[in-house]
């Protein structure tokens, strides 16, 4: 629910959950759900005091999560990778991602997630080509599996826009926007709206220029 922007509903469900009665094997799921909720809330709130409050709660639940996870579990590796990246150690994070990627089967939700997170690491390292490569792999997997969270695709669209490839940038962001609205993913609608407007404002004059024969800048595409 939190991933779809249904924060109030997600928070209410977690409030109704009696943590003390949960079996041990469900504790990682509980703490992970809490961590994701407050991470999303901290990202979207416009109030600085609430942002700090949500960030503190997200950190608290992340610490609790790490205490109940097996070090060999995929979620433990994912959280370790995120912590290394946040601490400014992208090379260490990439090494952990190497392990995760080696165990992620293509055309699975795990593969889509691991390749997306790998693209973020390459962004930190300033390796734009590898960032685009793994965004493309993640986006293709999302589409094949009908996953409606298109973070990979609209990030790729933004990169292509910055490189002047308006045709593909517009095509990808429009597809992402249409899918987001179809499934009423409110948080993604907010994220996509800004870059869609920016690309649209550039693309429409570009399209008119092509119609008059004056052409338009277009680069190579990752997809």
Predicted regions located by residue number:
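A "functional boundary" signal
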Residues: 1-212
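Selective detector of the "anchor" transmembrane alpha-helix that sits immediately C-terminal
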Residues: 217-223
């Amino acid at each position: 629910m939190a991933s779809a922007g249904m924060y109030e509903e997600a928070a209410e469900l977690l409030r109704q959950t009696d943590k003390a009665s949960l079996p041990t094997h469900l504790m990682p799921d509980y703490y992970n759900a809490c961590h994701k909720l407050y991470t999303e809330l901290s990202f979207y709130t416009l109030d600085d005091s609430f942002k700090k409050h949500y960030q503190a709660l997200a950190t608290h639940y992340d610490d609790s999560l790490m205490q109940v996870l097996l070090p060999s579990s995929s979620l433990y590796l994912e959280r370790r990778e995120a912590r290394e990246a946040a601490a400014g150690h992208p090379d260490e994070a990439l090494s952990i991602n190497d392990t995760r990627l080696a165990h992620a089967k293509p055309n699975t939700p795990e593969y889509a997630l691991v390749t997306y997170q790998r693209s973020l690491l390459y962004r930190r390292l300033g390796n734009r080509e590898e960032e685009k490569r793994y965004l493309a792999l993640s986006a293709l997997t999302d589409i094949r599996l009908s996953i409606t969270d298109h973070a990979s695709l609209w990030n790729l669209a933004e990169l292509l826009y910055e490189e002047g490839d308006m045709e593909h940038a517009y095509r990808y962001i429009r597809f992402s926007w249409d899918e987001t609205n179809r499934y009423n993913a409110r948080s993604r609608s907010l994220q996509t709206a800004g870059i869609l407007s920016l690309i649209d404002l550039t693309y429409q004059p570009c399209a008119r220029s092509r119609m008059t024969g004056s052409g338009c800048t277009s680069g190579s595409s990752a997809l």
